[in-house]
């Protein structure tokens, strides 16, 4: 017996089955922006150390960028506008070259000074109450074009407003 002949009509769809169990919640991949303020001294070896609190989860694949508050200016309405620069940043001083630099792990950020002269000769304006903005970009969010030199572009990309930036003063 052989099955030959024209193909028959398409059958009807079956009944929908019962919904399966819900899957586990996924990880909420969110970026974070933190401002830290600290002072470089001989006692802290001219470095500022910030350990991420347990409320901030940073993965090894995430990107951590640090910006330095370089200056403050005014807009046409007389409102203050912060000028941020992506680190590292180098200043040319009478004593020589001074570089503000950083490194990070998924546990912490270390911001430090490097120079070709004795750092104890620095003026307080170069060391005291310096403000840095740390931006944590999840690896999943860094695909495509993003101007990381512009903190406003980074914050917009992460969906973070100025009011949502956590402020931390280090001792």
What is the role of each PLM region?
Residues 30-131, 135-171:
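Extracellular or exported targeting regions of proteins
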Residues 2-32:
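Collagen/collagen-like triple-helix recognition
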């Amino acid at each position: 017996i052989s099955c030959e002949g024209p193909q028959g009509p398409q059958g009807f769809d079956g009944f929908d089955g019962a919904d399966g169990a819900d899957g586990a919640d996924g990880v909420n991949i969110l970026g974070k922006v933190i401002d830290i303020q600290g002072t470089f001294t001989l006692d802290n070896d001219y470095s500022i150390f910030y350990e991420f609190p347990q409320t901030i989860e940073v993965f090894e694949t995430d990107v951590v960028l640090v910006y330095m508050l370089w200056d403050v200016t005014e807009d046409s309405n007389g409102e203050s506008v912060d000028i941020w620069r992506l680190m590292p940043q180098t200043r040319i001083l009478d004593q020589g070259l001074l570089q503000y630099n950083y490194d990070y792990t998924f546990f912490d950020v270390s911001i430090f000074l490097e120079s070709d002269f004795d750092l104890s000769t620095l003026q307080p304006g170069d060391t005291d109450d310096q403000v840095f903005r740390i931006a944590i970009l999840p690896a999943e969010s860094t695909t495509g074009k993003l101007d990381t030199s512009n903190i406003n572009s980074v914050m917009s990309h992460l969906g973070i407003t100025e009011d949502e930036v956590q402020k931390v003063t280090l001792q």
